[in-house]
Amino acid sequence: MGPPEKESKAILKARGLEEEQKSERKMTSPENDSKSIQKDQGPEQEQTSESTMGPPEKESKAILKARGLEEEQKSERKMTSPENDSKSIQKDQGPEQEQTSESTMGPPEKDSKAILKARGLEEEQKSESTMSPSENVSRAILKDSGSEEVEQASERKMTSPENDSKSIQKDQGPEQEQTSETLQSKEEDEVTEADKDNGGDLQDYKAHVIAKFDTSVDLHYDSPEMKLLSDAFKPYQKTFQPHTIILHGRPGVGKSALARSIVLGWAQGKLFQKMSFVIFFSVREIKWTEKSSLAQLIAKECPDSWDLVTKIMSQPERLLFVIDGLDDMDSVLQHDDMTLSRDWKDEQPIYILMYSLLRKALLPQSFLIITTRNTGLEKLKSMVVSPLYILVEGLSASRRSQLVLENISNESDRIQVFHSLIENHQLFDQCQAPSVCSLVCEALQLQKKLGKRCTLPCQTLTGLYATLVFHQLTLKRPSQSALSQEEQITLVGLCMMAAEGVWTMRSVFYDDDLKNYSLKESEILALFHMNILLQVGHNSEQCYVFSHLSLQDFFAALYYVLEGLEEWNQHFCFIENQRSIMEVKRTDDTRLLGMKRFLFGLMNKDILKTLEVLFEYPVIPTVEQKLQHWVSLIAQQVNGTSPMDTLDAFYCLFESQDEEFVGGALKRFQEVWLLINQKMDLKVSSYCLKHCQNLKAIRVDIRDLLSVDNTLELCPVVTVQETQCKPLLMEWWGNFCSVLGSLRNLKELDLGDSILSQRAMKILCLELRNQSCRIQKLTFKSAEVVSGLKHLWKLLFSNQNLKYLNLGNTPMKDDDMKLACEALKHPKCSVETLRLDSCELTIIGYEMISTLLISTTRLKCLSLAKNRVGVKSMISLGNALSSSMCLLQKLILDNCGLTPASCHLLVSALFSNQNLTHLCLSNNSLGTEGVQQLCQFLRNPECALQRLILNHCNIVDDAYGFLAMRLANNTKLTHLSLTMNPVGDGAMKLLCEALKEPTCYLQELELVDCQLTQNCCEDLACMITTTKHLKSLDLGNNALGDKGVITLCEGLKQSSSSLRRLGLGACKLTSNCCEALSLAISCNPHLNSLNLVKNDFSTSGMLKLCSAFQCPVSNLGIIGLWKQEYYARVRRQLEEVEFVKPHVVIDGDWYASDEDDRNWWKN
């Protein structure tokens, strides 16, 4: 059941520009476009799978590209017909894949990836009256020529474009190019005698298929996508042959229409002629819980011909199943007890038959074409064998814009609607489905008609749907705005059915479902002026679907609002079988994303007032506080919250367009991390951040977005001058920066890893120069901001609140350093901390820094980590450090390539320095000689050094003796870190003896990964009971073992132990030491921080520790443990500890807690 290691994914895409042939009233008539498309084989590529309203995972997919131009005809009456978009599809198939045997029960270990690329040059013939330039197409979209059955029923204003004439060249290496006629004749020649033997039965079946689908499908079978689909099952380089094609995409983009076209194409002799039989199953038309054999299912599709069924089963290698809407069966395909059927005569629940076909247990030699929504794609991966994935996308960007704008005559209104449309990329993406595009068009027209009377928000899909649905209800009775009792029953029943469908992953409903919710089709039709619920299916029993899945999500969300009506609860049984609304908060459940956002959108006060009018009762949704609480949980779990969770919450709040509701949800936010990928992310974040009035720190990761402005791509749709189509991206960025500068409690802004153009940096710095900006700490670590540094230097002396600047990993040329130092020396510059880690500093750069150190009295901390400091550079720095005018207190020279010679120069300079209190020399090979020179400095009575970091400095042998001597008689040094040095048990004994001296004032000792064993633990236990000053001891990643910790606990149990922080992470501990450790915790009132991560504790051992954590004597506040590493019983006990002692924090990231400026040299 596990997913394959590699999956073959082909994404058929075609994006076209469309022109509209208008009637004489519009006075336009474009010519037909001719296009040529080349298809060649290319390397494997990765494609991100689309998901509904949610971020996608990156998947390795083969990308099928084609570009085409589309034209549209409009009759004078604007009569509508199904849209026939010309599509071009490319199929990529990658080599070096192994084919799974046809009888294999599971997915192959390696799925081949096929890559067929099509690239076309496009030319647009413009009519004299249409002066817009052609769209710059940057990616490909597969556009279905037809729309799904739902779209055909709901699409009242979709126009039917003409088919473009296209010529396609296929380059397949040594293979010869063939025309469609040659390909077709070749396939016909390959039809075997067995096909001819089927005689009249086969012809009758094909006639039945044609009669069934010919009225609902209109497609040209020589179109590019059909030619490419006809080759989809062909072996690639004789190494891999797909047996399953998966057509996936957003709801409503035309997957079902494409599936029906495939079946019809076979019946008409245009497609898949090597297949003797093609059987079509519509999942929405099948009651999959009923029992049947596969033969009986096929017989329903082949009326009055059981002999034909037998013939079909005799040739499974020439049998193609087309299964439409497999995701409608998701709820039953996920059962753990799924069995497999291998006999086509055995009666099983129909979902078992479908599952067995997917797994190739049933008719393993047959072929499958499956349609599914993007949200169902991940679950499908573990079921299919030898798959080829094809992405189906809907209307192109230009087509969507044209459909929305075609009924807006006023030019200023067109521009306003156009801008609001492209601002909201999620709303615009939803319009890829023709049915949604039609609903949006109707909503916009209704809003225009209502004018000032329309108070509902129009920036969101919730606002548009609310406008459309609620006014469809109220417009029926101008004199009576409220719903009658019967109408209320109908509306609430519809909402309940929609919610039940969302939770159970059902989008198809039957007569029994309508009865369960007191619904009648006639009453639904009478309640709305629009087709909310549509009849679909060709069988005797009708089934129903919402005109689009997003409408089902809307009504499902409305259910949770209506359940708060106490008056209404007397008439209807709410929540009988429904899930709690708090389950909607799970962002990883893609089926809930749409309903969740609509639910937030319905919290808008104007929408709630409209509902009050409809029901004649105050609407005070009980769900409002629950939603605000869910958002506040993100604020409380900063370390465990991903930036995508925060952004998802922001989008939900933005959907409401209600400032009071948003402010209540965000009042607890103090830290935020945002990942900005889309333009709309900026607008949504700006809207929400201005309500985070208690925000203190924000991290923003924004890449690529501000380097290219794609807004103008859609401008040709609007018939205005190009200069009027002003790019809005920088305006949105300016608004975002303005919000950051206006938050009165915001102190830290981290733009690390971001990519900001010169213009973006200019806008940012101008906003941060505002007097209202209170930001003190500004970080650009690893950000690409070099082109805009000149704007940053002006900010340094324009904002006197700025105290900290981090430019780590920013290449600093000498000219940059000159401007930076001039700004830092400015009288109005208040910067106290400057980090220039990995800035590629030169000797000239060091000279300018040295001059800076004696020219400013404000700079207190300087980091030059990961810059090479040679002898000449050290001489310059030494001259500055020895000057009485240098007031620097903290110096970080981590990984600067220091040698004993350069260390000698540094120490000589420090002898004259009475201000330096913090020094970090980590990751420099100082050796014994360098440490000896440092100890001479520590011996100096005027040495003010308090914190010394010597991690990974290759300190060996006698060096520890020198350190021990200096520690024993130094009353100023309080913190020493020797992490990742080979201290060993012998040197540890020397250090312990020094720490026991009353003249040693060391408070913190870091000894992580120092090759210590259990043999030093007796010395450590004795030391911690003797010293009165040591408060923190980190022994992590040392093999102390159970015996060592048991010995150490003897010291912890003593009342004389004043240790407050102890690190025992990754010390090879087991449950054998838990008894002693629990006892030490229970009787030690001083210990408040303990790290136990990466040890091997059993459940019994952890339960002992949990009992000790709850002991009243224990004052532990920070416990380093990963809860998810343990069984449910242990997790519950750890949660009980946090409940009993609310101040206790149990988290595996123990080092994140930076008490007492412990990580000063890292920050």
UniProtKB/Swiss-Prot annotation:
Major place of residence: cytoplasm
Residue ranges constituting the NACHT domain according to the UniProt record: 243-565
Effect of residue 308 to P: In strain: 129/Sv and CBA/J
Biased composition (Basic and acidic residues): 1-42, 56-94, 108-127, 153-173
Highest taxon, organism lineage: Eukaryota
Family to which this protein belongs: Belongs to the NLRP family.
Record's protein name: NACHT, LRR and PYD domains-containing protein 5
